Swiss-Prot record:
Gene Ontology CC terms, in alphabetical order: cytoplasm
Family note: Belongs to the MnmA/TRMU family.
PANTHER family, per database record: MITOCHONDRIAL TRNA-SPECIFIC 2-THIOURIDYLASE 1, TRNA 5-METHYLAMINOMETHYL-2-THIOURIDYLATE -METHYLTRANSFERASE
Protein name per its UniProtKB record: tRNA-specific 2-thiouridylase MnmA
S-S pairs: 100-201
Gene Ontology molecular function: ATP binding; tRNA binding; tRNA-uridine 2-sulfurtransferase activity
Residues at the active site: 100, 201
Annotated NCBIfam families: PRK00143.1 (NF001138), trmU (TIGR00420)
Localisation: Cytoplasm
Ranges for region Interaction with tRNA: 151-153, 317-318
E.C. no: 2.8.1.13
Record site feature (Interaction with tRNA), residues: 125, 349
Gene Ontology biological-process annotations: tRNA wobble position uridine thiolation
Length: 372
């Protein structure tokens, strides 16, 4: 019987490298695919594409798999980056990794892999897939959290559909990150000690405000407290996100006390796009930073349909602990009420629902309801 062919995305990082080795050990025919998805500034000091390709090719040689490079820069710019900029211009804070996974890593990449005769694709994400074997959902594929809760990436994968998940393997889903590092060291992979990437999907770890400034027009405006007092000037609403503390530029006013009695560090609490006004508050637990409910749109449900109205858990940001909530979901919209108020619920970010370890899907936060 011919081996199943798996095309794996190899980024030059440790996770995808160890994933390639694991797949080969499991008896698959493995082909590596390195994706180049950004080329606006290949010569920038922040662009690591060349080194990443060298690392990926070196690992492929050690592991014993073929590897090729493919350029998805045009697809990334059209499907991900353009939407990323539109969201920032609208005053929201998007998560490009969510859209990149759905549109590039599991769509453009999947399509290319099929042209290479792949039976399955694989990535180095920390998540799991499981086929339902009985009951009314028999044959459905579920997206589950990774065993290593500290590295779980199901939040970023919640927009994947049945067609995508049914063709996907996550070799690291049952493995802890510490074990991945050990395997890389034992294999003497050339990137065994390489740091994990923490930058924007495919764009890297460059200064974010400087990067946005190249693509967005901006207009300075007033920075106000809830009582309407002007305490400074913002450089442009696109450069701020709810809950932000650093980079506001009011470090010398920490002891200032507002009429509401709050004092302490300043946080971004609200963006009034219509009036180009940034509202800031003092104190981590200021009421303007706490939300009891949210609304979301652009829903994507893993099972292809909205979950029934029952108690679930939600995440409104990566690595947040699951939060108990009640919800009413349709194919297109979500209304969610938290059991306990949540901090800095941010329009543009994703609200993702879970039933235990099972990721149900989610959508883009459009608004939140303050506790006061």
């Amino acid at each position: 019987m011919a081996k199943k062919r798996v095309v794996i995305g190899m980024s030059g990082g440790v996770d995808s490298s160890v994933s390639a080795w694991l797949l080969k050990e499991q008896g698959y025919e493995v082909i590596g695919l390195f994706m180049k998805n950004w080329e606006d500034d290949d010569d920038s000091e922040y662009c690591s594409t060349r080194q990443d390709w060298i690392d990926a090719a070196s690992v492929a040689d050690v592991v014993g798999v073929d590897i090729e490079a493919v350029n998805f820069a045009a697809e990334y710019k059209d499907r991900v980056f353009a939407e990323f900029l539109r969201e920032y211009e609208a005053g929201r804070t998007p998560n490009p990794d969510v859209l990149c996974n759905a549109e590039i890593k599991f769509k453009a990449f999947l399509d290319h892999a099929m042209l290479l005769g792949a039976d399955m694709i694989a990535t180095g994400h920390y998540a799991r897939v499981r086929e339902v074997t009985s009951g009314p959902d028999a044959g459905q594929v579920q997206l589950l959290k990774a065993v290593d809760a500290s590295k779980d990436q199901s939040y970023f994968l919640h927009r994947l559909n049945q067609a995508q998940l049914s063709k996907t393997l996550f070799p690291l889903g049952e493995i802890r990150k510490t074990e991945v590092r050990k395997i890389a060291e034992q294999l003497q992979l050339p990137n065994a000690s390489k740091k994990d990437s923490t930058g924007i999907c495919f764009i890297g770890e460059r200064p974010f405000r400087e990067f946005l400034n190249r693509y967005l027009s901006y207009q300075p405006g007033p920075m106000k407290t809830p009582d309407g007092t002007i305490v400074g000037e913002h450089v442009g609403l696109s450069f701020y996100t709810l809950g932000q503390r650093k980079g506001i530029g009011l470090g010398g006013m920490k002891t200032h006390k507002n009429t509401d009695g709050n004092s302490g560090p300043w946080y971004v609490a609200r963006k009034d796009v219509a009036n180009n006004t940034l509202y800031i508050v003092q104190g981590h637990d200021h009421p303007w930073l706490l939300s009891s409910a949210l609304s979301a749109g652009q829903m994507s449900w893993v099972a292809g349909r909205a979950p029934s109205e029952e108690l679930v858990a939600a995440k409104t940001r990566y690595r947040q602990a699951d939060v108990a909530c009640s919800q009413h979901a349709t194919a297109d919209n979500l209304a969610l009420a938290f059991d306990t108020p949540q901090w800095a619920v941010t329009p543009g970010q994703s609200a993702v629902l879970y039933q235990g370890d099972v990721c149900l899907g989610g959508g883009i936060i459009t608004a939140s309801t303050l506790t006061e």
